[in-house]
């Protein structure tokens, strides 16, 4: 077993870092700070961070085949031109729910942008229940709604054979799976593949590795866990020196490094003293497994 190393690599004290995604072309890590309404791109070669400020909470960012990026801002699917910092609205959802916003999002293997919504929180993980829905933005900019009654739409990814969609609604305290039709984007046959243990707390962001195992960031649990979705067993736990771990992705030259985002919002003064790196970006090396490259939105 290789020796696992957890290091803080970017000290910016984000309020709620989320949605890390690796951009191979620029050797950069993209991520968002939801309540600060900023999308960040950290160049790991130059160690420079660029930011684009937007006009509403921004909950996820993804690569786009045409260049630039896509992001979920408020309740809008948007395209983002990084060079001139312009944002173009592609579609809107939940127009009847003024208190809603998007949360986590990710692009599927066919280039659709999946993202779900939730009610705006009154405190971290405190909100009006069952207000969210799961959507996807197709390459033609049409939107499909899959289901509603969601609490906090969160981590999502697809199996390596593209036949299973994995999904987290945080307050269910489970990781779920659906049968997935890559051609149509349809999902069906929802079932639970993992139930969180008490000390693992709230399941948040998620990514898959090159062996088909899932990695879940545990909000308030201060860890990422590796799961086998076929057996429902936890295979590994990697603890971090912060409680509010929010999401994870693989990156680096060969996708052998894991990047983890976290939050500081919700910590009191004592918590911030105890966790000076809350809100920073972490890198985990030595996991002995690689990730896969992220997919890009095809529209």
From Swiss-Prot:
Pathway entry: Cofactor biosynthesis; L-ascorbate biosynthesis via UDP-alpha-D-glucuronate pathway; L-ascorbate from UDP-alpha-D-glucuronate: step 3/4
Gene that produces this protein: Rgn
Q: What is its main location?
A: cytoplasm
Q: Catalytic residues per the record?
A: 204
Give the protein name, as stated in the record.
Answer: Regucalcin
Kindly list the places in or outside the cell where this protein is found, as annotated in its UniProt entry.
Cytoplasm
Describe the function of this protein.
Gluconolactonase with low activity towards other sugar lactones, including gulonolactone and galactonolactone. Catalyzes a key step in ascorbic acid (vitamin C) biosynthesis. Can also hydrolyze diisopropyl phosphorofluoridate and phenylacetate (in vitro). Calcium-binding protein. Modulates Ca(2+) signaling, and Ca(2+)-dependent cellular processes and enzyme activities.
Write down the SUPFAM superfamilies for this protein, in alphabetical order: Calcium-dependent phosphotriesterase
The residues the record assigns to binding a divalent metal cation are 18, 154, 204
The biological process GO terms on file are: intracellular calcium ion homeostasis; L-ascorbic acid biosynthetic process; positive regulation of ATP-dependent activity; regulation of calcium-mediated signaling
The induction field says: By calcium.
């Amino acid at each position: 077993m290789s020796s696992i190393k957890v290091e803080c690599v970017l000290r910016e004290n984000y309020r709620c870092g989320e949605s890390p995604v690796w951009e191979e072309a620029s050797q950069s890590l993209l991520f968002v700070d939801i309540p600060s309404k900023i999308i960040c791109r950290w160049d790991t070669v130059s160690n420079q961070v660029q930011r684009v400020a937007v006009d509403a909470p921004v909950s996820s960012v993804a690569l786009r085949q045409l260049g630039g990026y896509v992001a979920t801002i408020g309740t809008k699917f948007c395209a983002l031109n990084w060079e001139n910092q312009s944002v173009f609205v592609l579609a809107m959802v939940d127009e009847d729910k003024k208190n809603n916003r998007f949360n986590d999002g990710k692009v599927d293997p066919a280039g659709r942008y999946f993202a779900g919504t939730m009610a705006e929180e009154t405190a971290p993980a405190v909100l009006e229940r069952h207000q969210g829905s799961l959507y996807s933005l197709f390459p033609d900019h049409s939107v499909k709604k899959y289901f509603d009654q969601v609490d906090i739409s969160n981590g999502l990814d697809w199996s390596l054979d593209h036949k299973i969609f994995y999904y987290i609604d945080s307050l269910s305290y489970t990781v779920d799976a659906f049968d997935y039709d890559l051609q149509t984007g349809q999902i069906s046959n929802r079932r639970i593949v993992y139930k969180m243990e008490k000390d693992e707390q709230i399941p948040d962001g998620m990514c898959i590795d090159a062996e088909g195992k899932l990695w879940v960031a545990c909000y308030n649990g201060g860890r990422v866990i590796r799961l086998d979705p076929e057996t429902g067993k936890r295979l590994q736990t990697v603890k971090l020196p912060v409680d509010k771990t929010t999401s994870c992705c693989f990156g680096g030259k060969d996708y052998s490094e894991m990047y983890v985002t976290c939050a500081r919002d919700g910590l009191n003064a004592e918590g911030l003293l105890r966790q000076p790196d809350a809100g920073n970006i972490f890198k985990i090396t030595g996991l002995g497994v690689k990730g896969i490259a992220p997919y890009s939105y095809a529209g």
